[in-house]
Amino acid sequence: MGKKKGGKRLTKRDIADAIQALFQAHPGETLSFKQIFKALKFDTHPVKMLAIDVMEEMEWDDWLSRVSDNSYKLNLKTQVQEGTFIRKANGKNSFQPDDGGKPVFVAERNSMFALNGDRVKVAFMARRQNHIKEAIVTEILERKHDQAVGILQVEKDFAFLNAEGNFFTSDILIPKKKLKGGKTGEKAVVKIIQWPSAESKKIIGEVVDVLGKQGENNVEMHAILAQYGLPYKYPKKVEDAAQKINAEISAEEIARREDFRDVFTCTIDPKDAKDFDDALSIRKVGKHWEVGVHIADVSHYVTEGSIIDREAEQRATSVYLVDRTIPMLPERLCNFVCSLRPNEEKLSYSVIFELDDDANIKDWHLAHTVIKSDRRYAYEEVQEILEGKDGDYADELRTLDTLAKHLRERRFKNGAVKFDREELHFDIDDNGKPTRCYFKKSTDATQLIEEFMLLANRTVAEFIGKAGKAKKSEDPNKPSKSKGKTFVYRIHDQPDPQKLENLRTALAPFGYKVKTSGTKGAISKNLNKLMEESQGEREQKLVETLTLRAMMKAKYSTHNIGHYGLAFDYYTHFTSPIRRYPDTMVHRLLTRYQDGGRSVNQDHYEELCEHCSQMEQTAQYAERDSIKYKMVEFMADKVGLEFDAHISGVQSYGLYCEIDDNHCEGLVGMHDLDGDYYEFDERNYCLVGRRTHHKYQLGDAVRIKVARANIEKRQLDFILAD
C-alpha cells in the first residue's frame, strides 16, 4: 500500500476522503483516473487499484456517476438552490433555502469558506446510504459581513484580530501597516480585504476603527453594533444637512392643514423617551367621540432621495440597546424638529376617527394637521390615573382607556393571538452600569396607546388595500381610490402546520391539546387557550416560547396576505416614522395617492420592504446581545453568591435557571450536574439520571450559585448549590 509524506501508510479511509474532497472541489467536472491520480499523487499501483475500488463503491452509493470506463463526476441533483449559509461553532453548518423548508447540512469541507449569513448557491449531493442529506456550496453570491469586531493581538512581524461571534472561522491577519495605531488588547473594527480561497484559507483585513479598551461600556456597546454591521456614528454630512432644515412653521403651511392646536392632545411614552412619534387628541362631537391619532410628519422635512433620506433608508430602523438609542434620523430631527414635544406647534399626519361609546368607527378621515400637545405623560403617570389617582385631564385619559378596552376586546374576539410576554429591563447609572434588572409588564396605559396605533395602522392599510372595490371618494381628505395601488404592508403568515405538529408533540406530556388544523380563528383561539391555561404553571415559559416559535415572523411586503397574529386582513406601519423607515414610505405613498398620483413601481418597493425586514431582524439581534451583556455585567460582582431560582429551560447540554429576584438567566452545564449521568428526555423536556432516575424538570425550584460571569462571551454560568 502507498505511503503519505513522512512514511504513514494510506488507508482506504484516507483514499476515500481524498477522492471525496477532490470531487467536491470540482462539482461540475468530469475527472479521469489519470487526472485523479495526478491531483492526489497516487503513484503506486496498489494505491491506484484501491482508489478505483473506492470510486466503484461511491458509484454504487450513487455518490459518483460513471461517465466512461475511466472517468467519473460528482452525482449532484439537477436542481441548484440559493439561500443563506448558517455557520455553527460546533461545525454543524447548514444551508437555509430562500423558499423555506428545512435546513440542509453542509460539511466544512464543502463550505467554500462561506461565513455566517452569506448568500450562497448550493447543489444537493446524492444521499449515500445511512447518510443525512447534504449540500455543497458552489458559489458565494453575497458576503453578509465585510467587517469583523474583536481583540487585537500585535506581534513582532504581524498582527491579527480574534473575532467575536460565529461569523468568522479563524483569526483575521492584519498587516502591521494596516493597524491604524491599534494595540494588543484593544477592541477594533476590521474590514476584510482578502477572503479565503482554494489557494489560501487566510482572511486578511485592515483596521478601520479602534474602539478602545475592552470592558469599557461605550466600547462594548459600539462593538455589538459593529459586529452586526450597524452604524454607531452619524456621518457629518447628514448631521450638517439636518442642521440646515428650517423648523419654522409658516402661516401658509398652517392654512393648508387641519388645525388641532385647540383640541386636547397628549403624548404617552416611556419615561426616558425623547422621540415622540405619536400623540392622541380627544373631544366630544355630538353624540360621538372624535379621537385623533397624530403622527410626526417626518416626510414633510425629509425629502425623498435627500442625503438624510438615503441614510435613513440604509439604517431602516432605530436600534434600542439597553443603555442607548441609535436613531434612524439625526438627533435634531428625531428629538426636536419632528418630535411631538409638549407646548410646541408641530406638523403631523393624522387619522381622525369618529367613534361611538363602544369604539365602533362611524366615520374617519386622513389629514395633514398641525397640533400642540398639552401634556407629555409617562406610562407610569397614566397608569396611576387610570387606577383612580387624580391627575391632569383624567377624564379624557379614562375615556380613551374605555374606548381602547372595547377595541382590544373586539380584536381578540375576532381571533387575535395574545402575546403579552414580559420584557427584561435594566436601570442604568451614569456610567452605563446596570443597577437593577426586572421584568416590565404590559399595563392598561401601554395597551391604550397600542390599541389606537393598531387602529390607525389597520385603517389606512385597509383603505388602500381595498382600492378599486368602491367608488372614488368625494372627500378631499381621503386618498383617491384606484385599483391596484402599490403599498407597504406589515404581513404575518399563518403558523406552519409542521410547526404546530411539533408544538403538539412537545406539549402533549404536560396535558395540553394543540389544534394543528382548522380555520385561522379556531387555531388562534386554541393558542390563546394554551397560554391562558399555562399561566402560573411551571411550564408557562416553555409554552410561551414554543408557541412563539410556531408562529411565522412578521415582515414588510407589497404583497398583502393579512396579519395572522392581529387577525387583520390589512395592516401596515404608519405610526412611527421617526424610528421606522417603512412608516415614512407609507406616509409618502398615502400623500401621493391622496393627491391623485399614479401607483409606484412595485418591484422597487418590494426590495425596500425586504431590506427593512432584514434590518429589523439585525437590530433585534444587537438588542438581545446588549441585554445579554448587561445581564452578565450585572451579575459580575455576585460570583460565589447563592440565589433562589427555578428551571426555565432544559436542553441536551444542561439546565437554564432564572433567578427569582432579578430574572437573570444562566446555564448549569451538564458536566456540573453531580451524582449521576443525566440524559435529555426531549419529549418531556427534562433531564433524567441514568442510575437514580432523578429528574430535573421545567419550573422546578432550585438553589444556584453564580460560578462564572464571562462578560467578553456574554455568558453566565451557575452551579447547583444543594
Predicted regions and their residues:
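Charge-lined substrate channels and their catalytic hotspots, especially those that engage the 3′ end
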Residues: 2-292, 299-344, 376, 384, ...
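Electropositive polyanion-binding surfaces
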Residues: 38, 189, 194-196, 213, ...
